[in-house]
From Swiss-Prot:
Organism field: Lacticaseibacillus casei (strain BL23)
Family: Belongs to the Thz kinase family.
Pathway the protein contributes to: Cofactor biosynthesis; thiamine diphosphate biosynthesis; 4-methyl-5-(2-phosphoethyl)-thiazole from 5-(2-hydroxyethyl)-4-methylthiazole: step 1/1
SUPFAM superfamilies: Ribokinase-like
Binding site for ATP: K125, T178
Name the record gives this protein: Hydroxyethylthiazole kinase
Annotated substrate binding sites: M50, G205
Length: 280
């Protein structure tokens, strides 16, 4: 029998947001969405630093509370920086999120993702198609976008089973696959999250922002599963509010509204009533 997601993570939903501290999140990411990610962190009262030079790692790791590694724009130098940061994070017990952007598109990203997984990060995320490829299932994704064909009930169940298999080798890692229904899998269980609106797929960086939000919550000491569930639900609810307030506007206005809600919605006592999801 399924359980309502807010019952399972009641304490986290009640206390995680608004933040009571300002975790410093080190982001090694892509140039396309770096500004959106930095501002999203600031909007929830976290602090971003976008430092990807290995020479600075010892000093920045000593200051930061969490690490986000995003594969959105790969070069030979950035690949080496991502690998070095992953190892540094493991050695210093830094909470880490790996965002597998484009892993379904190229073998290089697939291999890099698995190299980073070997460091036992806290969270590994991607869209449904990316996570299917990562789990060695057939994926119909193109570029960095997920495919509707990968989001059927059968495909989602197949992915959940494959990710559960991965948790046997990586029991301290939580896996997130985002889509129309978001799938969260860890050694502790499987959860479906059901908030969001289609417009969130229509502007770039939404998945990157979710990764940053997860890292921020990990930086406050929240456990992996709770950080993922709360961050995904919160961002999707921000999108729902923005869509409701922007019925006649365009996508640019919707984007602005969603980002605005990051700094507003947590102060609304009834936002938890919006959350939809279940534990399987």
């Amino acid at each position: 029998m399924s359980k309502v997601i807010t019952d399972v993570f009641y304490t986290a939903f009640k206390t995680a947001l608004p933040l009571t501290s300002s975790p410093l999140v080190q982001c090694i990411t892509n140039e396309i969405t770096v500004e959106s990610m930095a501002n999203a962190l600031l909007y929830i009262d976290a602090k971003p630093v976008m430092a990807d030079d290995q020479r600075e790692f010892p000093e920045f790791f000593a200051q930061s509370d969490a690490l986000l590694l995003n594969l959105g724009h790969i070069s030979e130098v950035r690949q080496q920086n991502l690998l070095a940061a992953g190892k540094f994070a493991q050695a210093t017990n830094q909470p880490t999120v790996i965002d597998l952007v484009g892993v379904s598109a190229t073998q290089l990203r697939y291999d890099l993702g698995h190299q980073l997984l070997a460091n036992h990060p806290n969270v590994v995320k991607g869209n449904i198609s990316e996570m299917r490829r990562f789990a060695d299932l057939k994926s119909t994704g193109r570029g960095v976008d997920g495919s509707q064909l990968d989001q059927s009930a059968t495909a989602l169940g197949e992915l959940a089973a494959s990710l559960q298999q991965l948790t046997q080798a990586f029991p301290t890692t939580t896996f997130l696959a985002t889509g129309k229904i978001d799938l969260v899998v860890s050694a502790k269980g499987t959860w479906y999250l059901k908030n969001g609106v289609p417009q969130l797929d229509r502007f770039t960086g939404t998945g990157d922002i979710v990764g940053a939000l997860i890292a921020a919550l990990l930086g406050t000491g929240l456990d992996n599963d709770a950080a993922v569930v709360v961050a995904v639900s919160y961002f999707n609810c921000c999108g729902e509010v923005a869509a409701a307030q922007n019925r006649t506007g365009g996508l640019a206005a919707f984007r602005e509204g969603t980002l605005n809600q990051l700094s507003l919605l947590a102060a609304t006592a009834d936002w938890l009533q919006m959350v939809k999801g279940e534990a399987l």
